[in-house]
Amino acid sequence: MASENMTPQDYIGHHLTNLQMDLRTFSLVDPHNPPATFWTLNIDSMFFSVVLGLLFLAMFRSVAKKATSGVPGKFQTAIELVIGFVHGSVKDMYHGKSKLIAPLALTVFVWVFLMNLMDLLPIDLLPYIGEHVFGLPALRVVPSADVNITLSMALGVFILILFYSIKMKGVSGFVKELTLQPFNHWAFIPVNLILEGVSLLSKPVSLGLRLFGNMYAGELIFILIAGLLPWWSQWILNVPWAIFHILIITLQAFIFMVLTIVYLSMASEEH
């Protein structure tokens, strides 16, 4: 993809372009003339997020089937460490009673981590294969650098927040929480509704945009290094940034998991 006939601007733009499908015609969108329409699906982001989700399920299912009470192997030990870490985080932060929270937190952490991990692949590897083997006009391989994916995950968390709020407090209790806090007087209902409504809606928005912003920035830095520097000097910056980026992708997965647990814990508290 870093072909000689590409300017740095073309190279950067190409790697920031998704493989899209027009849902009205079920045809691939020309990346040089993308339609400004709601009915467009980023099929590369969807594909990689689903594949990584299935990979997560396959790995954990394989370990569960082969789990032994004897001396565990290295892979089983790593999986057990992750499960223990997530279980400890849930135990410390979620004080309600729900069998869903720990599996949800584990899924969120590992799934987001795997999506973030795609950012460490060589920039041109999968796009080159996509173009020269499958004839794809564009391909982005980091699902968490797509705002549609991160906001969709955040929307799922938001639905659970509403579910647990209504389950624990009832419809009337949830409505009272929105209308009688922080000012417990009927005259302040409009003010309370605005304040609590903004606070409630800001949770999924900030959750999704935080992950997207950090991963998009990381992806962009890799692309800038590959697109603007000579090939022989790219490793000088790529290797240190990749090592530092390992911390970033792990931290972002952890933050997404922690905020999910905290938001659901707040929703489960009875006032």
Curated annotation (Swiss-Prot):
Record's protein name: ATP synthase subunit a
Species the sequence originates in: Enterobacter sp. (strain 638)
HAMAP family xref list: ATP_synth_a_bact (MF_01393)
Molecular functions per Gene Ontology: proton-transporting ATP synthase activity, rotational mechanism
Keywords from the UniProt entry: ATP synthesis, Cell inner membrane, Cell membrane, CF(0), Hydrogen ion transport, Ion transport, Membrane, Transmembrane, Transmembrane helix, Transport
Function: Key component of the proton channel; it plays a direct role in the translocation of protons across the membrane.
GO CC list: plasma membrane; proton-transporting ATP synthase complex
Membrane topology, as annotated: Multi-pass membrane protein
